[in-house]
């Protein structure tokens, strides 16, 4: 249960749709990126900067970000904590 997650430069994604956040340096991930481009499922949110993370969604879309995977993961954690706080307020009434 995640909300919208900032992946840099004003771009946000639906956190619930992301299944992996990975470092783009390995050869298999470079192939995955190229395959997604050929299939029309590549979303480049780097604004021309170096790709530092690849996000893989449940719809097999590949999202490129210029933000480090650790930073994006931390934003997921912060989002989850915030949602839990909101749910706790609702439960207490």
UniProtKB/Swiss-Prot annotation:
Disulfide bonds: none annotated. InterPro entries: RemA-like (IPR007169). It comes from the Bacteria. Signal peptide: none annotated. It holds the Pfam family RemA-like. Belongs to the RemA family. This is Putative regulatory protein Fnod_1678. It comes from Fervidobacterium nodosum (strain ATCC 35602 / DSM 5306 / Rt17-B1).
């Amino acid at each position: 249960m995640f909300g919208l997650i900032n992946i840099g430069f004003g771009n946000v994604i639906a956190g619930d749709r992301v299944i992996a956040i990975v470092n783009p340096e390995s050869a298999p991930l470079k192939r995955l990126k190229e395959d997604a481009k050929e299939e029309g499922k590549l979303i480049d949110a780097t604004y021309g900067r170096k790709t530092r993370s690849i996000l893989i969604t449940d719809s097999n879309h590949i999202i490129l970000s210029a933000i480090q995977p650790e930073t994006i993961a931390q934003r997921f954690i912060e989002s989850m904590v915030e949602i839990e706080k909101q749910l706790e307020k609702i439960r207490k009434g």
